[in-house]
Design a protein with these regions (language model features):
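Sequence-structural signature of the catalytic-core scaffold of metal-dependent phosphohydrolases
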Residues: 1-100, 108-249
Length: 249
């Protein structure tokens, strides 16, 4: 499969490597073309953009930010990333996971977008919503017991939207179809954390090495760069896109 280049009215040309081209050709991703970005087309008839192009725009910003992020690590922190080193492998996997999460951060949106989102939070006999249990099960299937216990302890402290929980679950459960033989180059739990905005708690690690602390810091920075209460690549795309497509000045 070859690289795709898509012309976007906001960001210009968006390049996708073969692995991401394969993902956007999937039925799961193509359905986003039928889910509008917002519900304001009644007031702004020109605002006909959808979750498909927004996801591509968010991915594009993520790839740009990731490269600058690596450059800043080297320059500002004085980190040496030697070819073939464990540090290089870790950072490459983190960046891959960030781009993967950015592309799929809205894959869990239902028809009518946020309007029907509340129905995701249905419960069974347990007090825990079904989608929360589904995400926990998905994470448990791809990490060690120790890592799962950590996630299970930190997840309740997050407050993700229902569609974010669904997106995080899908990027794990469909990973074999999306990533194929490249799956080992991605940290699926980290990608899920990025989508739901669930950072790692430093206090749970005791006496960790400087390199381990650095890696955790990098992970948390990129988690916030996709899902935060302030500025992130998701907001940067949809604010710019909504403004231009609605004709708002």
């Amino acid at each position: 499969m070859s690289m795709k280049i898509i012309k976007d009215s906001i960001h210009g040309y968006i390049s996708l490597d073969p692995i991401y081209s394969h993902i956007i050709d999937s039925p799961e991703f193509q359905r986003l073309k039928n889910i509008e970005q917002g519900s304001f087309r009644v007031l702004y008839p020109a605002a006909r953009h959808d979750r498909f192009i927004h996801s591509l725009g968010t991915f594009h910003l993520a790839t740009m930010f990731a490269q600058h992020f690596i450059d800043n690590i080297k320059e500002d922190l004085g980190v040496t990333i030697t070819e073939g080193s464990e540090m290089q492998h870790s950072i490459t996997q983190i960046i891959n996971s960030f781009c993967y999460a950015a592309l799929l951060h809205d894959i869990g949106h239902a028809p009518f977008s946020h309007t029907t989102e509340k129905f995701f939070k249905m419960k069974t006999d347990s007090s825990i919503p079904v989608i929360d249990m589904q995400l926990r099960d998905a994470v448990k299937s791809v990490v060690s017991e120790e890592s799962f216990q950590r996630f299970d302890g930190e997840f309740p402290g997050c407050s993700p939207s229902p569609h974010e929980i669904m997106s995080a679950t899908i990027l794990i459960t469909n990973a074999n179809n999306f990533l194929g033989e490249n799956i080992a180059n991605f940290d699926l739990e980290l990608a899920a954390r990025m989508v739901i905005g669930c950072t790692y708690d430093y206090n749970k690690d005791g006496n960790i090495s400087p390199d381990e602390k650095l890696i955790l810091g990098i992970k948390n920075c990129l988690i916030r760069l996709l899902n935060s209460q302030t500025v992130d690549v998701d907001k940067l795309d949809y604010i710019t896109r909504d403004t231009q497509m609605s004709g708002f000045e």
